[in-house]
Each structure stands twice: as structure tokens, then as C-alpha cells.
Amino acid sequence: MSIAIPLGVTTSDTSYSDMAAGSDPESVEASPAVNEKSVYSTHNYGTTQRHGCRGLPYATIIPRSDLNGLPSPVEERCGDSPNSEGETVPTWCPCGLSQDGFLLNCDKCRGMSRGKVIRLHRRKQDNISGGDSSATESWDEELSPSTVLYTATQHTPTSITLTVRRTKPKKRKKSPEKGRAAPKTKKIKNSPSEAQNLDENTTEGWENRIRLWTDQYEEAFTNQYSADVQNALEQHLHSSKEFVGKPTILDTINKTELACNNTVIGSQMQLQLGRVTRVQKHRKILRAARDLALDTLIIEYRGKVMLRQQFEVNGHFFKKPYPFVLFYSKFNGVEMCVDARTFGNDARFIRRSCTPNAEVRHMIADGMIHLCIYAVSAITKDAEVTIAFDYEYSNCNYKVDCACHKGNRNCPIQKRNPNATELPLLPPPPSLPTIGAETRRRKARRKELEMEQQNEASEENNDQQSQEVPEKVTVSSDHEEVDNPEEKPEEEKEEVIDDQENLAHSRRTREDRKVEAIMHAFENLEKRKKRRDQPLEQSNSDVEITTTTSETPVGEETKTEAPESEVSNSVSNVTIPSTPQSVGVNTRRSSQAGDIAAEKLVPKPPPAKPSRPRPKSRISRYRTSSAQRLKRQKQANAQQAELSQAALEEGGSNSLVTPTEAGSLDSSGENRPLTGSDPTVVSITGSHVNRAASKYPKTKKYLVTEWLNDKAEKQECPVECPLRITTDPTVLATTLNMLPGLIHSPLICTTPKHYIRFGSPFIPERRRRPLLPDGTFSSCKKRWIKQALEEGMTQTSSVPQETRTQHLYQSNENSSSSSICKDNADLLSPLKKWKSRYLMEQNVTKLLRPLSPVTPPPPNSGSKSPQLATPGSSHPGEEECRNGYSLMFSPVTSLTTASRCNTPLQFELCHRKDLDLAKVGYLDSNTNSCADRPSLLNSGHSDLAPHPSLGPTSETGFPSRSGDGHQTLVRNSDQAFRTEFNLMYAYSPLNAMPRADGLYRGSPLVGDRKPLHLDGGYCSPAEGFSSRYEHGLMKDLSRGSLSPGGERACEGVPSAPQNPPQRKKVSLLEYRKRKQEAKENSAGGGGDSAQSKSKSAGAGQGSSNSVSDTGAHGVQGSSARTPSSPHKKFSPSHSSMSHLEAVSPSDSRGTSSSHCRPQENISSRWMVPTSVERLREGGSIPKVLRSSVRVAQKGEPSPTWESNITEKDSDPADGEGPETLSSALSKGATVYSPSRYSYQLLQCDSPRTESQSLLQQSSSPFRGHPTQSPGYSYRTTALRPGNPPSHGSSESSLSSTSYSSPAHPVSTDSLAPFTGTPGYFSSQPHSGNSTGSNLPRRSCPSSAASPTLQGPSDSPTSDSVSQSSTGTLSSTSFPQNSRSSLPSDLRTISLPSAGQSAVYQASRVSAVSNSQHYPHRGSGGVHQYRLQPLQGSGVKTQTGLS
């Protein structure tokens, strides 16, 4: 390709353009004519693409043959030469299409074109100052060699022309040459063998390339000049005529070269001025053949002269340390370079040094520039000739090799290099640079080999090498070699050994390497873990073991294979005294560090460096779940790690433990048996490991254990710090899983679901725990549930419910998370977002049904809750709420609040003002009712009073509600509503899901989907967990909103203000659908819902009279919480249940239905899942829901539903029936509120979780929610049996699921019908929904809320709810189970909530049942349940206390 073109000749341009693609003269030969060649070159785009080096000068460079008359050997190397072709080209005629589709001619076929090309080259060569003899010596050979050279540098397609192999190499710079020059020793650089070698990006490839460049290059007798350089020279000559016609300089250069060094004999300089010496396996240096005086012309640096930008077109140089390229910029400021990688002379071996003894000077002869090396100082014989760095080494991303004495500590290059003292084991420049580009596998392989070799060498030579210089560990550096040429043989031997080892290593099975890499990754992780844990162990244990000491052995183990790890441990034992330094590096030091440490107290940084990348590459390669899990565990142990770090720092100097002991500690700390580890150490570390094992935050077991431990340690915290509010939005979002209750962090809801789903594991445990030191604020995982259960069983009783209610209430109002986490860390444990979503959706669905029940007039105020019914219907704004905000004001206000929280965030937002007004009005009416309610509250309070949980809220609410019930009710209602809304907002996505559930309440798919989630298994627990969490949140809500009246108060007054602002965004389509469904529910199930609501309100008031009277929310929350012991609540609840009966579904229906429509419209509008949610739940769910809604509207749910509902109603109608219904309704009501529902589901979840989960899994669309799942499951089952009432059935299923455990035990009779038939589901699920919706909300707001409900409906609900709370609730969800043992606890709230919900939702459900599937069941039960679902869905129920 180097075609010599006379200066000024335009043909240079032409030739360059022809060869612009980097085509070689060969390519020209390939085509019969130059034009063909140009065409071919135009087609060389392939090669051009390969060689990003478009502007390489070689296109116009005079062919070496022309310029230099390349020797025949070069010709042979060339693909053109028959020999080279024979070697590189197939024996058969290669004529044919190249890969690019271009015609390729073999040598025989190219005879004519070759002659032409040779003639052209000759003519061009004549124009060039280079000797003609060289050109004449090897025309053909030169053509191909030059072509090869060009191809290599230009990456032109000529390689394609010559041989198929050429096309193979795609290395931009050398691919063509590789293809052709493989046979030629000097051009092997681009030979196929080189192509087969690894890429330059890999260490092996780079080393091979350097070897080829070092040993196989074409001797340059003259320079090859690129067209650009020629143009620049021409311009320069024109501008400075003085230099023209001075051949003497050239003659001098040639004479010097001839006299000194330019013979093609071998790679060493044969003449006196210079001698090439091999200093390393692939490195040679230029030594002075004799003493050289100052300014002596040592040698001309020959090669391909081109502009620097041409060489750097490929951008390779600063990626790799090209050793044979000289950069020069002192010629008129022109940046040029001489590329001697494949074409050059011995000057190419000159190395750069920070203390050069020679410099490059340019001379111009015959119009051509010559770069010569002049001595700038006297150079003694055999001294290395070095020049200054001609490039900015600081820009090189690889280790730059400096020729200065290795002992030079002032070398800026060595200082710059990370491991200046160490040269890479392989050719120093290439090895480091290649690390980055090296493939992970190769890098890991290479590092493993290096480490193994080093480990072996260090182990074998620990005593000997410990005294040796670290450099010996690696192949002696170039400097070393330069200084000690005699070491070359040793180095070569070492290199050979290394190569063999590399081969052996490469032969290692992939499994072995993978295992080793995995082992290293785990060891590294374990080491880190040990670092954190060991300080604690040291502080805890008497043995003072330096983590660094132990880590060093561990590191060695990590880096060496299992057998090697032991050896490395022994080695590290030797090095341990000096190991303290390696503490930070231990992972990187690994086996190398240990070995080198044995050799050298301070391991070389390079060994550490190689080992460092390998762990990284392996970790990245083997980014297994286990590794991630370890990482998460590390994060979870972050706090401990910090302590450990401090301990490490303190004990860093304490490397007193024997290496074995340290190794054992490391391994044991890693939970990995360490062979030969000290039993004592192991035991110590084992204890620490056990301690650490319990700290894995991502492990459910760990979470539960930690949470329980924290709770056990800090169970008193809720009482002490009821308001522990965490304002950290991240913590709140992750820990509470997007509790919207955090007023200060409204964006929490935007927290990624995965954040919540992982229980905010992303927040370092140290961050999370400091925020949640009490342990109640721990991750919201099953451990929360477990804690909730245990706490519900122990702490609820231990901590006054009122206090807990207060805490929850305050926390919810201020920061839902803090008090919840404090009091009901279990219940408040943030639900996983999906769980919350499902719960919310389910609740929303319920809310959709109970919208009218939320508004049900108090016609069925019945027994003790005429006020409840009255508040339900007495709220002036409640009616409005029913219309627009009825849920907020409906007697099911709690449910509405829950609904609001669940789904109608937007709705509430929309209704906020009205709600506030309505709430005020409702509070007034509620206060009026409270006049009655105080009696209820008092009666309930007397029942609830025993429950401490009711204490603060209950007591405060009760007395104050009795006295200033209105204010308290308003305040409590507002707070409860806020809390409830916060919960709902927090679960807004969840609400959307529950909404979807509610929306799809009748949809069998919904039921199916929910069951599917339940099938998940986790879904049920998760839902239960969500329910618990919601309960915690809903406790506050429940306080005010738990009782139907209280709920209304919450909705009417405080709830609306808080919930409305946080509207849940819903797609327009979804909004319209929800609105339509709400309307449908109002129309079809409106009467039922209203009646149910009224009945629920009445029953709820009856059940939570004290709650409702004292305060819609505050008192109710207290009351509900007080009934944490469901029994107490239940005795009032019994009355409430009577009231529920009084509010027969038909009555409730009539009233609730009317109310339910507005509410349901609103609630369903917001509670109905978004289109996305619907899609999520299943496209058919909305249709089923609509059909179910229509059926509900028609009041013709499946006969089974109706009969079942009627059955259930009849059961309540019976002496026990009311109780059962009350319990069921209470639970159903509770279920309706997302929190209540969640909690109810939890209740159901523990004992019934299995069954209900299964049912819900099959029927519930929101299977993801364990809590909802149970209810949904039933609902779905009901729905499946009666698809026509699918909406109602889905709703009832949800209800059933919600209260399943509590409600089912409460209304076992009616539940039994539900079990088999849609009707049964309808009745029971509604009861469950009410319980789940209301209970979670009421119980979440306060365990008292649930008890409050239960208090009023104590007689009916007390037995069954308490029973279900304790038994079924417990069975339904272990969290609830735990709570159920603590009826007063928030967990038990579900039951009390269930009671109150039963009362309150009895009306709701009645309305819902009547209007939907529930009407068939029986006016009372059906309506109540149906109302519940509506409210639960997202009408007023969510905004209210649902």
C-alpha cells in the first residue's frame, strides 16, 4: 500500500483515494487494473469498517517494495508471494468472491495485474527517495508485504483480496496483515495465527501482538510516508528551499545506519552503535553497541511515517501501549508519528524513560523527513538507549512502562501507575492495559493463573522469596531486565512457565473456574461480613482477633481454590504480622496477598490488583441470587458493619490471633467451615455468625426474628413513644411501604413498589434501625406479621389499647408510620405494595358496594345504634357524601374512611371540602348520635374500658365524647380519617387493587385472580400483613371511624379533609368505569347498600355505640380499639348486632341503597381499579364486576347468594344469628376498609388463611393480597357459583375473605352457606368484607376500633368475633391470630372491628347485600355485607372508616 508518489504528483491523491480504504498494493494487484483496485478499494468498506483508520497514510504511502525494495523474505511473507500464499492462502485457486463479495484473484490469476502494479510502484518508487534497489529486490514480495502492512495499519480490504484468512482478522489495525502475514515472521503481526490470538483487548492477545511486533516485523530500509506527510513535507520544502537538495544529510543517515545498526540480520543491531537486547519475553531494548558521545546519531527511527491523527484514527494507542510507534511534533508543529510496529528497524525497540539519554531529531533529505535518535548525553556501552516520552503518558489508561531504573523512586510514570513498582507479569505495558478490555472470563482465568502461580511460588518460596524483592514474584520488570540482561534467560523460563500455566489454567474446566470464582465471590462477601461481625465478636468475645488478620487468610482462601485456600491460610499465617495493612485490601490481596506477604511482609500492590479485578469480574459474572442475597445481608448488617468497622479500626492493630485462628474466624464468620480452623475461633465466629445470621434482613426468618426481638425488647416503646414519627420520607416509604399517612412526605406513594415489597431493604439497616430503634419500625415483612400476632397476643394486652390507639392515632395523623410502628409495628408494618394494593382494591370493591350502605339511613339503627344509623343518615353531608362524598359521611364513615383510604383518595379529595362540611354536619348529627353514642360508647366503653388500648383514645374519646362527643368525635374522626386516609393513600396503589377487586367484586376473574394471589401463598400472609398494617393505620381511623357513626364522623369531618387531598389518580376510563359502576351499584345495590349501611351504621353504632357516640373516629377508634378484646366490644356489639338485625338488609337496602348509589358512585368511581389495575387483575374482571353490579342493581344476585345471604341474615336474625351476623358484619365491615379488610384478611389468614387463601386464590382477583385473598377467595367462590351476581359475589367473597377468620367464626352458620355457594360467599364474604374492610381500618386505626365495633355488637359479635378473633381470626391470619389472642390488641381489632364493622357494616353489608348479591341473602345480612363491599371498595367506605 505504500505507494511512493512524487511530491506534488496528484496521483498520490488518486492512489490514496484508491487505497483510501486502506487497500494494499495487493488489493491493487488483485484487480487487473488500478481502476479495478480502486473499485475494489471502494468496496473495501468492509475492511475500512474493520480498520477505523480511514486516513492511514499508507493509502498513499509508497509501497515498501518500491520505496525500500523489500527483501524477498518480506515478499514471501506477503500474501502475494507464492510462499506466503501457500501458507496463508488455500492451496486451491482462491479466485472467487471474497466475504465482501469482491472478486479475489490468486497469484496465478493476478500475474498481469501484479506486473502492472509493480510497474506503477516502480514509477512511484523512482519518485521516492527510498532506495530503488529495495523496490527492485522484491516487487511482488514488496507489494504484498506493503499491502499487508497497509492492511494492518489501514485495515484496508486488501487483506480480503489476498486470502480468505485476511478477511478473518477483524482487528482494525492488524486484521489484514494477520490474514496474510501469518507465514512471514515479520508480518506475523497480522498473520492468521495472530488473528487467532486473543484480541488486543485481552492480555493474551495483546501479549501475542507485542511478541509478533517484537519479533516479526519487516525491516525498514527507508521510510514509508503517507500522502499527508508528503504534502506537509512538500509545503515545508516549498517554504524552505534551503533544505531541498541536501542529500548529504540522508547520506549521513544512511551511512550511520549502515555503519551502526541497520542490517536485517536478526533482531539485534549488529553494528557498533546499537544492539537490541531482549529484556523480557516480549520486550527488547536498544543498547548502545559502544560508548556514544553527546549528539551522536544513534539510529534513524524508520517505519511508516504518517500524521499522528492518521495513526490515532483507530484510537488504539491510548487504549494500548503500542511499543513501536514514535510520535514527533517538532517539525513545524506537525503532529506526526512513525509506525514501526510491523515495518521498521531496530530503533523501534527504543524505550521511553523519564530520564532519557537520547532524543529524536528530524532531518529532511530529498524532501523527506527522517527522525533520528541522537544521544543527548554520553551513553556507555551496553547502556540502554532511551528517549523521552513522546506522548502524554498521563492520558494512557494503561500502565505505562518507563525505562528508567526500576529502583528510581522519583519516576513520575511509576508514581502515576497504580502499581509502579510492579510491572505486569506479562509484557508490562500490555498486561495492565488489557485488564479493562479483557473479557471477564479471560481476565478471571489469567488472574487465577497468576494468583495460583504466585501462591504456589510464594508458598514454595515463602522463606526464600520473603527476602527477595517483590519484583521477583512477577516476571522481572523491563527495568530490571535492562539492568540485568543475564536475568533474561530466567525471565524467559519464567515466561515459558507462565505460558504453560496459562495453558493449564485455560484447560481447567469451566466448572472449576466457575466454582473458584463463586468461591471467591462468596469469600469476599464473607470477608466483608466478617469485618463487620468480627469487631463485634472481638468486643463480645475475649479473643482479640484482628479482622484484618482473619481477613487476610480469608482473602487468600477466596482467591485460591479450596485446597489452595488452606495453603494460603498458612502463608497468610506467615504474613499475618504484616497483614494488618492488608485489612482493607484483603479481598484484593487474596491468595496473592497472602503469598506475597509470606514472601514480602507488605504484599506488592500488583498482586492485590490482579486479585482485585478477578473478584470483581467473578462477582459481576456470578451475580447470583446468593451473591445478591449476601449483598442485601451486608446492607442489612450495615449498622453492625459500621460498628464492626469501628471495632476493626480499634482492633486493626490487634492482629494477635494466629493466622490459623484468623482464617478459622474468617471462614466461620463466613459460615463456611474452614479446614484446620481453630475450634475455639470457630466457635467464637460461629456464635457471631449465628448472631449475624439472624440479622439477614432479606430473610423472612431473619426479619421476623429481628422484628420479634426488637419488639420484645421494645414492646414498651409504643407506650413510651406513641408518636415516634419518622419524617424520613425514604424510611417512611420503604419501611411503611408508601404509607400516604405521612403528611410531610406525600411523595412516598411514588416510592417504587420494589422498595415496599422488599420491606425497604434498600434503606441500610443502620439507617432503618436508627429510625426505628424500637424494632417496631423494622422491615415490614412477615416478621411484622409475626410480631403483630405475638404483639397482638402479648403487647395488645400489655399495652393499653387506648394508648396504642392514641399512638396509632397520633402517628397516623402526624406520621402514620411512626405510631403504627410503635404500637402496631406488626399491624402497621408497611404492607408490601402489591399486598396493600390488593387489599385496597378489595376494600374498594367493597366500598363500591357499600357506598349506599355508607349512606344508609339509620332505619336499622336497631338496638344501640340508632345514633349510628342516625349518623349514617343524619349526616347532612353524609347524604352529600353518598351523592358525592356519602361514603365519607355515611354511617359507614369508618368504612368510608377506609374506602377513602383504599381507593377514593381522589373521591375524598374531591369531596374533601364537602366532606369537611358534611363531616361537620355529620359530626353534629354524629354528635347528636353521639348523644346516643356516648351511651353506646359508654356501654361499649364499659366493655371497652377494660381494654387499655381503648384507654387513651377510648377513654379520651369516651369521656370527651360523652362530654364533648362532637368535638372529640370530630377530632377523632378527623384524625381517624387522616390516619385512615393516610393508610388508604399509602395503599393507594393497593386501594386501586382493592378497588379493582371491588370493581370486579362480582367478577369471577377477580375472585379467581385474588385466589391466584392467595395461591401465591405469600399473598395471603402478605395480605394479612397488609391488613395488619392497615389495621395499625386504621386503628386511628377506626377510632373515629370504626363505629359506623364514628366512621361517618371521620368521613364527614376529619376524614374528608385529609383523604380528599390525596386523591388516587385513576385513568379517565377507569374513573368513568368506576363512576358507572358506582352508579350501577347505587342503582342496583344502592338500596341494599344504603340499608346495609344504615343497618351497618345502626349495628355499628350498636356494636360501637361507645365508639360512635364518643367520637365517630376517636371514640370509635378507642371503642374499636377497646374491643380489642372483642368480647367486651362484642357485648355492646351484640346490641349492635341486634341493631344490625334491626337494620335488616332490606331496610338497609332501602336506605343504604339510596345512599349507596351516590357513595358507591363516588366510591366505585375511586375504588374501581384503574384500567391498568383492571388489566392487571384481568380484563374480564371489570366485565364480571359490571355484570355483578348489574345483578346487584337488579337485586338478583345468584339465588345461591341470596339464599346464602338470607341464610346468613337469618342466622343473625336468630338469637345467635345477630351475633354471628354482627360478627360477620363487623368483620365484613372491617374488611371493607382496606386496613380493616386487610386486617380481617389477616385474621382470616391465620387459621383460615389456608382455606380462605385457597378460596380467595380461586375467586379473589387480588390474589396478591393474602388478607384480601381469603375474603376474595370466598367471594370468588361465591362469585363463581353465582357469576350473575359476580359483582356482589365478588364483593361478598371479599367480605368473606376479609373477615373470613373472624367473620366466619362469628357467622359460622352463614359462612357455611357461603362456603358451598355463591350465596354463602355473598353473605359471608360481605360479612368478611365488612370485617376486613372495616376491621382493618378500624382495627388498624386502633385495636380499640375493632373492639368498639365489637363492643356494640358484643353480644352477637363478641362471641363469634372474639371467637373468630381468637380462634378463627387467629386461624385466618396468624397476625390476627396473635391479635386475636389479644382481642384488645390491634390485631384483635379485626374482631372488634369485625364486631363494630359487623354492626356498622352489618348495615353496610345489608345494603350491599341487598343491592348486590346480598339482597338475595337476606335484607339485613345481604345489605350489610353489600354495603360493606361498596364502602370497602372505595366510596365513602374508604374515605370514611371502612
Swiss-Prot record:
Biased composition (Acidic residues): 451-462, 492-501
Catalytic activity as recorded in UniProt: L-lysyl(9)-[histone H3] + S-adenosyl-L-methionine = N(6)-methyl-L-lysyl(9)-[histone H3] + S-adenosyl-L-homocysteine + H(+); L-lysyl(36)-[histone H3] + 3 S-adenosyl-L-methionine = N(6),N(6),N(6)-trimethyl-L-lysyl(36)-[histone H3] + 3 S-adenosyl-L-homocysteine + 3 H(+)
An individual GO BP term: regulation of DNA-templated transcription elongation
Modified-residue entries (Phosphothreonine), positions: 855
This protein's record includes keyword Transcription regulation: yes
Polar residues bias locations: 190-202, 536-552, 575-593, 793-810, 861-873, 1145-1164, 1266-1276, 1320-1334, 1374-1383, 1430-1442
Protein task: Chromatin regulator required for brain development: acts as a regulator of RNA elongation rate, thereby regulating neural stem cell (NSC) proliferation and synaptic transmission. May act by mediating trimethylation of 'Lys-36' of histone H3 (H3K36me3), which is essential to allow on-time RNA elongation dynamics. Also monomethylates 'Lys-9' of histone H3 (H3K9me1) in vitro. The relevance of histone methyltransferase activity is however subject to discussion.
Subunit-level organization: Interacts with components of the PAF1 complex (PAF1C) such as LEO1, CTR9 and CDC73. Interacts with NCOR1. Interacts with HDAC3.
Name of this chain's protein: Histone-lysine N-methyltransferase SETD5
Organism, scientific name: Homo sapiens
